[in-house]
Protein backbone atom coordinates (compact mmCIF):
# COMPACT_ATOMS: atom_id res chain seq x y z
CA UNK A 1 0.00 0.00 0.00
CA UNK A 2 1.42 3.37 -1.03
CA UNK A 3 1.85 5.85 1.79
CA UNK A 4 1.04 9.51 1.08
CA UNK A 5 2.10 12.40 3.35
CA UNK A 6 0.15 15.65 2.87
CA UNK A 7 1.25 18.96 4.37
CA UNK A 8 -1.71 21.29 4.80
CA UNK A 9 -4.03 18.33 4.38
CA UNK A 10 -6.78 19.95 6.46
CA UNK A 11 -7.08 22.87 4.04
CA UNK A 12 -9.44 23.51 1.13
CA UNK A 13 -7.68 21.30 -1.41
CA UNK A 14 -6.26 18.80 1.07
CA UNK A 15 -9.60 18.10 2.72
CA UNK A 16 -11.00 17.23 -0.72
CA UNK A 17 -8.00 15.11 -1.72
CA UNK A 18 -7.72 12.98 1.43
CA UNK A 19 -10.98 10.97 1.11
CA UNK A 20 -10.31 10.40 -2.60
CA UNK A 21 -6.92 8.88 -1.80
CA UNK A 22 -8.33 6.75 1.01
CA UNK A 23 -11.08 5.48 -1.28
CA UNK A 24 -8.46 4.46 -3.84
CA UNK A 25 -6.42 2.38 -1.41
CA UNK A 26 -3.73 4.75 -0.20
CA UNK A 27 -2.57 5.17 3.37
CA UNK A 28 -2.72 8.90 4.10
CA UNK A 29 -1.01 10.99 6.76
CA UNK A 30 -2.09 14.61 7.14
CA UNK A 31 0.45 17.01 8.64
CA UNK A 32 -1.25 20.30 9.51
CA UNK A 33 -1.06 23.01 12.18
CA UNK A 34 -4.87 23.37 12.09
CA UNK A 35 -4.70 27.15 11.70
CA UNK A 36 -8.20 26.95 10.20
CA UNK A 37 -9.39 24.13 12.43
CA UNK A 38 -9.79 20.45 11.71
CA UNK A 39 -13.48 20.11 10.86
CA UNK A 40 -12.65 19.38 7.23
CA UNK A 41 -10.83 16.12 8.01
CA UNK A 42 -12.55 14.88 11.18
CA UNK A 43 -14.74 12.42 9.24
CA UNK A 44 -11.59 10.60 8.06
CA UNK A 45 -10.57 9.47 11.55
CA UNK A 46 -12.83 6.43 11.28
CA UNK A 47 -10.70 5.15 8.39
CA UNK A 48 -7.98 2.67 9.48
CA UNK A 49 -5.55 3.96 6.84
CA UNK A 50 -5.83 7.60 7.91
CA UNK A 51 -3.29 9.24 10.21
CA UNK A 52 -3.01 12.77 11.52
CA UNK A 53 0.01 14.65 12.88
CA UNK A 54 -0.40 18.16 14.23
CA UNK A 55 2.66 20.08 13.15
CA UNK A 56 4.05 23.11 11.36
CA UNK A 57 6.32 23.01 8.30
CA UNK A 58 8.50 25.64 10.00
CA UNK A 59 9.31 23.06 12.70
CA UNK A 60 12.00 21.33 10.66
CA UNK A 61 12.89 18.55 13.09
CA UNK A 62 9.29 17.48 13.67
CA UNK A 63 8.51 17.76 9.96
CA UNK A 64 11.45 15.62 8.88
CA UNK A 65 10.76 12.87 11.40
CA UNK A 66 7.10 12.83 10.34
CA UNK A 67 7.93 12.55 6.62
CA UNK A 68 9.96 9.36 6.99
CA UNK A 69 8.55 6.16 5.59
CA UNK A 70 6.20 7.71 3.02
CA UNK A 71 6.31 7.09 -0.72
CA UNK A 72 4.79 10.40 -1.83
CA UNK A 73 4.85 13.86 -0.25
CA UNK A 74 2.11 16.27 -1.35
CA UNK A 75 3.08 19.76 -0.22
CA UNK A 76 -0.01 21.97 0.10
CA UNK A 77 0.73 23.87 3.33
CA UNK A 78 0.94 27.59 2.58
CA UNK A 79 -0.35 31.06 3.30
CA UNK A 80 -2.76 31.25 0.38
CA UNK A 81 -4.02 34.24 -1.54
CA UNK A 82 -3.32 37.94 -1.95
CA UNK A 83 -5.28 39.08 1.10
CA UNK A 84 -3.89 36.54 3.56
CA UNK A 85 -0.31 37.20 2.48
CA UNK A 86 -0.67 40.97 2.83
CA UNK A 87 -1.80 40.59 6.44
CA UNK A 88 1.68 39.38 7.43
CA UNK A 89 4.18 39.58 4.59
CA UNK A 90 7.20 38.31 6.52
CA UNK A 91 5.35 35.28 7.84
CA UNK A 92 4.00 34.52 4.38
CA UNK A 93 7.53 34.37 2.98
CA UNK A 94 8.65 32.19 5.89
CA UNK A 95 5.87 29.68 5.33
CA UNK A 96 5.76 29.67 1.53
CA UNK A 97 9.52 29.85 0.94
CA UNK A 98 11.39 28.62 4.02
CA UNK A 99 8.67 26.10 4.84
CA UNK A 100 9.05 24.64 1.36
CA UNK A 101 12.83 24.49 1.77
CA UNK A 102 12.23 22.50 4.95
CA UNK A 103 10.01 20.05 3.06
CA UNK A 104 12.58 19.58 0.28
CA UNK A 105 15.41 19.07 2.76
CA UNK A 106 13.40 16.34 4.50
CA UNK A 107 13.04 14.18 1.38
CA UNK A 108 15.10 10.99 1.17
CA UNK A 109 15.81 11.07 -2.57
CA UNK A 110 13.39 8.29 -3.47
CA UNK A 111 10.21 10.02 -2.34
CA UNK A 112 8.07 11.70 -4.98
CA UNK A 113 7.26 15.35 -4.22
CA UNK A 114 4.08 16.92 -5.59
CA UNK A 115 3.95 20.67 -4.99
CA UNK A 116 0.81 22.77 -5.00
CA UNK A 117 1.97 25.92 -6.77
CA UNK A 118 -0.19 28.66 -8.30
CA UNK A 119 -1.00 30.42 -11.53
CA UNK A 120 -0.25 33.66 -9.66
CA UNK A 121 3.40 32.92 -10.44
CA UNK A 122 2.83 34.10 -14.01
CA UNK A 123 1.72 37.65 -13.27
CA UNK A 124 0.26 39.55 -16.22
CA UNK A 125 0.43 37.51 -19.42
CA UNK A 126 -0.92 38.04 -22.93
CA UNK A 127 -2.25 34.77 -24.28
CA UNK A 128 -2.30 31.27 -22.84
CA UNK A 129 0.23 30.27 -20.19
CA UNK A 130 2.36 27.16 -20.68
CA UNK A 131 5.15 25.50 -18.72
CA UNK A 132 7.61 27.64 -20.70
CA UNK A 133 5.89 30.98 -20.02
CA UNK A 134 8.29 33.21 -18.02
CA UNK A 135 7.27 33.79 -14.41
CA UNK A 136 6.66 37.38 -13.36
CA UNK A 137 4.69 37.29 -10.09
CA UNK A 138 3.19 40.60 -8.99
CA UNK A 139 1.72 39.79 -5.57
CA UNK A 140 3.38 38.70 -2.34
CA UNK A 141 1.54 35.43 -2.70
CA UNK A 142 2.86 34.85 -6.21
CA UNK A 143 6.40 35.90 -5.34
CA UNK A 144 6.61 33.70 -2.25
CA UNK A 145 5.14 30.70 -4.07
CA UNK A 146 7.53 31.20 -6.99
CA UNK A 147 10.46 31.09 -4.58
CA UNK A 148 9.02 27.88 -3.13
CA UNK A 149 8.59 26.38 -6.59
CA UNK A 150 12.22 27.13 -7.44
CA UNK A 151 13.30 25.14 -4.39
CA UNK A 152 11.01 22.25 -5.32
CA UNK A 153 12.38 22.00 -8.87
CA UNK A 154 15.92 21.55 -7.54
CA UNK A 155 14.78 18.14 -6.26
CA UNK A 156 15.09 15.49 -8.97
CA UNK A 157 11.89 13.61 -8.17
CA UNK A 158 9.40 16.47 -8.10
CA UNK A 159 6.43 17.92 -9.96
CA UNK A 160 4.92 21.39 -9.46
CA UNK A 161 1.28 22.08 -10.33
CA UNK A 162 0.39 25.72 -10.96
CA UNK A 163 -3.24 25.61 -9.93
CA UNK A 164 -5.83 27.92 -11.41
CA UNK A 165 -8.29 29.61 -9.03
CA UNK A 166 -10.18 26.74 -7.42
CA UNK A 167 -13.91 26.61 -6.77
CA UNK A 168 -16.51 24.16 -5.55
CA UNK A 169 -17.56 22.51 -2.29
CA UNK A 170 -14.95 21.10 0.07
CA UNK A 171 -15.12 19.72 3.62
CA UNK A 172 -13.10 22.85 4.49
CA UNK A 173 -15.14 25.32 2.47
CA UNK A 174 -13.73 28.69 1.41
CA UNK A 175 -16.17 31.47 0.56
CA UNK A 176 -13.42 33.95 -0.29
CA UNK A 177 -12.73 32.26 -3.64
CA UNK A 178 -14.36 34.13 -6.51
CA UNK A 179 -16.81 31.55 -7.88
CA UNK A 180 -17.75 30.38 -4.38
CA UNK A 181 -18.25 34.00 -3.29
CA UNK A 182 -20.48 34.79 -6.27
CA UNK A 183 -22.48 31.59 -5.78
CA UNK A 184 -23.00 32.35 -2.10
CA UNK A 185 -24.07 35.93 -2.85
CA UNK A 186 -26.51 34.82 -5.54
CA UNK A 187 -28.11 32.26 -3.23
CA UNK A 188 -28.18 34.23 0.02
CA UNK A 189 -28.30 37.88 -1.05
CA UNK A 190 -30.11 37.25 -4.36
CA UNK A 191 -27.63 39.38 -6.32
CA UNK A 192 -23.95 39.43 -7.25
CA UNK A 193 -21.49 42.30 -7.50
CA UNK A 194 -18.98 41.89 -10.32
CA UNK A 195 -15.69 43.61 -9.60
CA UNK A 196 -12.28 43.85 -11.25
CA UNK A 197 -13.97 43.44 -14.62
CA UNK A 198 -10.68 44.07 -16.45
CA UNK A 199 -9.08 40.98 -14.88
CA UNK A 200 -9.14 37.58 -16.55
CA UNK A 201 -8.78 34.36 -14.56
CA UNK A 202 -8.68 30.65 -15.15
CA UNK A 203 -10.70 28.38 -12.86
CA UNK A 204 -10.61 24.73 -11.86
CA UNK A 205 -13.00 22.70 -9.74
CA UNK A 206 -11.35 21.58 -6.52
CA UNK A 207 -12.11 17.93 -7.31
CA UNK A 208 -10.31 18.24 -10.66
CA UNK A 209 -7.05 19.25 -8.98
Each model region followed by its residue ranges:
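NAD(P)-dependent short-chain dehydrogenase/reductase
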Residues: 127, 138, 150-201, 206-208
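NAD(P)H-binding glycine-rich loop region in Rossmannoid oxidoreductase-like domains
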Residues: 57-94
Amino acid sequence: MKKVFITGGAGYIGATLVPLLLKNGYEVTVYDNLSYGGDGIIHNFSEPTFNFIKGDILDKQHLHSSMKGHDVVVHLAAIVGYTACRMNEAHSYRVNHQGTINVVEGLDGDQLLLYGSTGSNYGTVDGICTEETPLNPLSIYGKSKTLGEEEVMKYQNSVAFRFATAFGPSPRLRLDLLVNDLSYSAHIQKYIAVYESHFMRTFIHVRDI
